[in-house]
UniProtKB/Swiss-Prot annotation:
Biological processes per GO annotation: ubiquinone biosynthetic process
Active site feature: 318
Binding site for Mn(2+): 177, 243
Localization: Cell membrane
EC numbers on record: 4.1.1.98
GO molecular function term, any single one: 3-octaprenyl-4-hydroxybenzoate carboxy-lyase activity
Source superkingdom: Bacteria
A single cellular component GO annotation: cytosol
Function: Catalyzes the decarboxylation of 3-octaprenyl-4-hydroxy benzoate to 2-octaprenylphenol, an intermediate step in ubiquinone biosynthesis.
Gene that produces this protein: ubiD
Ranges in coiled-coil conformation: none
Protein name: 3-octaprenyl-4-hydroxybenzoate carboxy-lyase
Family membership: Belongs to the UbiD family.
Length: 518
C-alpha cells in the first residue's frame, strides 16, 4: 500500500494496530523520550501524543520503531521477516540503478529500458496551493518555541529538532539534496544545523560559500513528510538519482513538490503535503564573532563557510549512548514557517541502542546486502549489529577463494559506500558461520584467528566525530579481523576440521526423538 502523506500512513498504522493515541498529558521535556524508549524496547506501536500542555501541536513518535513499520513506510505490508526480504529487493533495485549490468540479450535490454523509464516517470512534479502552505507564520509570528520540540535527555543543551528533512542545493546543481541533521534550538527563529563535513548539506553549503562569498545560503527544513520521502532521505540513493525521485519509485507515484515562499529560498522545493516547513538562510557573520568560551574548541577558520554565522552546538545524548562533545556548526535563521491546518510535529530521540535510528539501521542493513554483492560477488551476507551503533562494526560472511581474500574484502567494504567510512571494526567469516548469532561469530574469532597474523590495523582514517574514543576528533584507526579458515600460504599447520555428526545417525535419532517423547 502506498501513502500520499504522513496522515495517510498514520491512518493505516492505526487500522493495523501499529499506532496508539496517547490522550494523557505527556511533556516533550524528557517524558516523551522515556515513554517512547520503553515502547520501542517492547516492540510496541507508534505513538501519537495529544498536543502537550501549553502547545497546539500533536507529536508523532516511535514511527519507525519496528522493521515492519519501516517496510510499511516503503509500501510493503508484511511481517518482520517478510519485510526484511522485501528490503533486499529494494537493495537490488538500488544496485541496478547505481551500476546497471550491460545487457546480454534483447530481453535484458528491454528490462534495462523499463527500469530507466520507471525512473524517468517518477520525476517529481510541481503543484500550486499546496496543503503545506495552508497556514503561514512570518515576521514577528515566527517562533519556534510554539512547536513541541523535544528535550530528550537530562544533560542536553536544550530542545532538539530530530526528524527534520533538510533541503539544500549546491551551486549549478539541478538536484536537490535531502538530509537529516539534528538542530539545536537557540532562539525563537534560530537553530544550529549540525551537519558533518562529508554530508550532502555541508558539501552544498561549502560549494555555495566558495562561489558566492557574503551571500545568504537558502535552506528549508521539512517536518512530517510522507514515509517514502522520509525513508528516501536515509537510504543510500545513487548520486544520479534525487531522493524525491526515489521516493516516487517507493510510493509508485510522482512526488508532489511546492516552491518555498520566502524570496531567495524559493529556489528550493518541499513535499507539498508536508506537515510543517521551516524556510530561511544561513547568513554571513556580521562583524567580528565573539571569542570562543573558555574550554570550548576554536571557532572554524580557513575556509569560505567559516565566514558564516556559527554557534557552539551540544552537548547532546546521541546514538552511542553518551553525551557528545561541543562543536561549532552553522546557524540556520528561520524567516518563515508554513504548515497544514492541524499540523502534526514528527519527532524522535537517539540514545544507547536500541533506538529508532538503530531499527532503521537493521532495515537498511538489508538494503546494503545486494549493493555490496553487486560489487563483491564473494560476499554472501552482511550484518551491522545494532549494538555497534548500526555502523561502527560490520560482520561479513564470504565465500573464500584464495589466501588473503578476506583482507581484500575488508578494504573493499571500507571504501565502497560513504556509509562505511566510519565503520571501525570489520570481522570476516566463512559461509558456515551465522553472522547474526554472536555465539557463532565469537566461536569463529576464538578458533580461527591468530591476533598477529589475522588482525589488520589502519591508522589515521576518517572516524565519526561523535566517537570520543578516537585520539583526534574525526580521525582514528580501524581494525579488521580475518576469522576465516586459513588457506595454504596463510598457515603452515594442518587446519582443523569442524566436527559434524553422521547424517544417517541424525536421521535415526530424529525418529527416536518422537518415540521417546522428547
Amino acid at each position: 500500500m502506498k501513502y500520499k502523506d504522513l496522515r495517510d500512513f498514520i491512518q493505516r498504522l492505526e487500522a493495523l494496530g501499529e499506532l496508539r493515541r496517547v490522550t494523557q498529558p505527556v511533556s516533550p521535556v524528557l517524558e516523551m523520550t522515556e515513554l517512547c524508549d520503553r515502547v520501542l524496547r517492547a516492540g510496541g506501536p507508534a505513538l501519537l501524543f495529544n498536543a502537550p500542555p501549553g502547545n497546539a501541536f500533536p507529536v508523532l513518535g516511535n514511527l519507525f520503531g519496528t522493521p515492519r513499520r519501516v517496510a510499511l513506510g516503503m509500501g510493503v505490508d508484511a511481517g518482520d521477516d517478510a519485510a526484511l526480504g522485501s528490503l533486499r529487493d529494494l537493495g537490488r533495485l538500488l544496485s541496478a540503478l547505481k551500476e546497471p549490468d550491460p545487457p546480454k540479450s534483447l530481453k535484458d535490454a528491454g528490462k534495462l529500458l523499463s527500469l530507466a523509464k520507471a525512473v524517468w516517470d517518477m520525476a517529481p512534479k510541481s503543484v500550486s496551493s499546496p496543503p503545506c502552505q495552508e497556514i503561514v507564520w512570518e515576521g514577528a509570528d515566527v517562533d519556534l518555541n510554539k512547536l513541541p520540540i523535544q528535550t530528550c535527555w537530562p544533560g542536553d543543551a536544550g530542545p532538539l529538532v530530530t526528524w527534520g528533512l533538510t533541503v539544500t542545493r549546491g551551486p549549478n546543481k539541478s538536484r536537490q539534496n535531502l538530509g537529516i541533521y539534528r538542530q539545536q534550538l537557540i532562539g525563537r527563529n534560530k537553530l544550529i544545523m549540525r551537519w558533518l563535513a562529508h554530508r550532502g548539506g555541508a558539501l552544498d553549503f561549502r560549494e555555495f560559500a566558495l562561489q558566492n562569498p557574503g551571500k545568504p545560503y537558502p535552506v528549508a527544513v521539512v517536518l512530517g513528510a510522507d514515509p517514502a520521502t522520509t525513508l528516501g532521505a536515509v537510504t543510500p540513493v545513487p548520486d544520479s538519482l534525487s531522493e524525491y525521485q526515489f521516493a516516487g519509485l517507493l510510493r509508485g507515484s510522482r512526488t508532489e513538490l511546492a516552491k518555498c515562499l520566502t524570496p531567495g529560498v524559493d529556489t528550493l522545493q518541499v513535499p507539498a503535503r508536508a506537515e510543517i516547513v521551516l524556510e530561511g538562510f544561513i547568513h554571513p557573520q556580521e562583524g567580528a564573532p565573539a571569542p570562543a568560551p573558555a574550554g570550548a574548541p576554536p571557532r572554524p577558520a580557513g575556509n569560505a563557510a567559516a565566514a558564516y554565522e556559527h554557534a557552539l552546538e551540544g552537548p547532546y545524548g546521541d546514538h552511542t549512548g553518551y553525551y557528545n562533545e561541543q562543536e561549532w556548526f552553522p546557524v540556520f535563521t528561520v524567516e518563515r514557517i508554513t504548515m497544514r491546518r492541524d499540523a502534526i510535529y514528527h519527532s524522535t530521540y537517539t540514545g544507547k541502542p536500541p533506538d529508532e535510528p538503530a531499527v532503521l539501521g537493521v532495515a537498511l542493513n538489508e538494503v546494503f546486502v545486494p549493493l555490496l554483492q553487486k560489487q563483491f560477488t564473494e560476499i554472501t551476507d552482511f550484518y551491522l549489529p545494532p549494538e555497534g551503533c548500526s555502523y561502527r562494526m560490520a560482520i561479513v560472511q564470504m565465500k573464500k577463494s584464495y589466501a588473503g581474500h578476506a583482507k581484500r574484502v575488508m578494504f573493499g567494504v571500507w571504501s565502497f559506500l560513504r556509509q562505511f567510512m566510519y565503520t571501525k571494526f570489520i570481522v570476516v567469516v566463512d559461509e558456515d558461520v551465522n553472522i547474526r548469532d554472536w555465539k557463532e561469530v565469537i566461536w569463529a574469532i576464538t578458533t580461527r584467528v591468530d591476533p598477529v597474523r589475522d588482525t589488520v590495523m589502519v591508522d589515521s582514517t576518517p572516524i565519526d566525530y561523535l566517537d570520543f574514543a578516537s585520539p583526534v576528533a574525526g580521525l582514528g584507526s580501524k581494525m579488521g579481523l580475518d576469522a576465516t579458515n586459513k588457506w595454504p600460504g596463510e598457515t603452515s599447520r594442518e587446519w582443523g576440521r569442524p566436527i559434524e555428526m553422521d547424517a544417517a545417525v541424525k536421521a535415526r535419532v530424529d525418529r527416536l526423538w518422537q518415540e521417546i517423547g522428547l
